[in-house]
Amino acid sequence: MKMPAMGLGTFRLKGEPLLATLNTGLALGYRHIDTAQIYDNESEVGEVLATTSVPRSDIYLTTKVWTSEFAEGKLIPSLKTSLEKLRTDYLDLALIHWPSPNDEVPMAVYLEQLVEAKSLGLTREIGVSNFTVTQLKDAIDILGPGAIAHQQVEIHPLLQNRKVVEFCQEQGIAITAYMPLAYGKVLSEPILMEIGKYHKVSAAQVSLAWLLAQGMTVIPSSTKREHQAANLAALEVSLSSEEMAQIATLERGERCADPDFAPVWD
């Protein structure tokens, strides 16, 4: 199954709010759910997958392996546990959530386990998240060209991550933009508001449309039905080349996700 360009992000959502969010999203037409081991919500995602009328084969499911599961012999059992919680026998995409902090576990150790997970049928595609260009190059050296299908990374008009984006595009690595609305910071950007006014859409929809126009997948997180519907409607927003260029001027390196164990960013 090809990854749908619009997905449901589940970061910081748990329990009943998450169940309601996912069921509403599926009813609206979303067919892509993004979760992670560290989110501690795979069981809720699994409950929805088990009870929805939407067939599992119609839903693109991603989870991410946490850094505590990288050591030799740990990654595959951790993914099997994720599958049990998710109540499914396969993932569409399994990602390395972050590079091993301070390279405590050699990259080859966890990437080779991820490849094995794919060969065992636990996941259909594999990829990484939050990797720098140097780390992506190292990963390609370890696994060979074409092995890494995907990179998930923070991208929005205020943090455009151009070096990483360009490298991924050169290598044929698909990109998912997380935090595509920069925790709502894009909503008050005058350029986005002005473009939105012209198209009769919101600044948030313009931000999403800008990412989508570059061939990226986006996974905004929202618990409100009207916001979920508006995000989906961004798929229909068509920006001119002039508008795309205007939005490109908003770059200011405003990173939202920068934990102390993050790599040295490009």
Language-model-derived ranges and their functions:
Residues 99-266:
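Beta/alpha (TIM)-barrel catalytic core signal, keyed to glycine-rich beta->alpha loops juxtaposed to Asp/Glu
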Residues 43-50, 79-83, 114, 136-140:
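Short, well-ordered amphipathic alpha-helices
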Residues 13-26, 71-86, 107-109, 136-137, ...:
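Short, acidic/polar
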Residues 1-59, 113, 182, 263-264:
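N-terminal binding-site loop/beta-alpha segment at the start of enzyme catalytic domains
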Residues 32, 90-93, 125, 150:
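Residues at the N-termini of beta-strands
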Residues 75-96, 116-120, 142:
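CE4/NodB-like, metal-dependent polysaccharide N-deacetylase domain
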